[in-house]
Every structure is written in structure tokens, then in C-alpha cells.
Amino acid sequence: MAKNKGVRIVITLECTECRSNPAKRSPGVSRYTTEKNRRNTTERLEIKKFCPHCNKSTIHKEIK
């Protein structure tokens, strides 16, 4: 029998200000990878993390 997948999945977090802000320190979009528990957090994740392109802490949202 095949084993079922675990509850934890790998997600990607992307900076929300990098796309709309043309005056950045460097070109590009900040992305982080992390895991989340599918049972406990069913909605999309939003975490404040440091963006090296904007050079400040910004909100990073989960992307598909």
C-alpha cells in the first residue's frame, strides 16, 4: 500500500512590495520557502520578514 502524504507542505512566501515598488535597492523579488501544517493553517500565510531587495521588513504572502 502507498503511504499517504504528510500534513506538512512546503510553501513559498513572496514580498508584496517588490512587485509594486520600482525604486528598490536592487532588482528582483524576495522569496522564502517554509513549511506549514495544512490542518492548523488552512488559509494563506502572511508573515513579516526581511526583504533584501527593499532593504526593510515587509509582508510576505504565500503564493501557489
UniProtKB/Swiss-Prot annotation:
Keyword vocabulary terms for this entry: Ribonucleoprotein, Ribosomal protein
An individual GO BP term: translation
PROSITE patterns per record: RIBOSOMAL_L33
GO molecular function, one term: structural constituent of ribosome
GO cellular component, one term: cytoplasm
SUPFAM superfamilies per the UniProt record, alphabetical: Zn-binding ribosomal proteins
Source organism, top-level taxon: Bacteria
Keyword Cytoplasm annotated: no
Gene3D superfamilies: Ribosomal protein L33 (2.20.28.120)
InterPro entries assigned to the protein according to its UniProt record, in alphabetical order: Ribosomal_bL33, Ribosomal_bL33_CS, Ribosomal_bL33_sf, Ribosomal_zn-bd
Pfam families attached to this UniProt entry: Ribosomal_L33 (PF00471)
Matches recorded under PANTHER family: 50S RIBOSOMAL PROTEIN L33, CHLOROPLASTIC (PTHR43168), LARGE RIBOSOMAL SUBUNIT PROTEIN BL33C (PTHR43168:SF2)
Family to which the UniProt record says this protein belongs: Belongs to the bacterial ribosomal protein bL33 family.
Official protein name in the record: Large ribosomal subunit protein bL33A
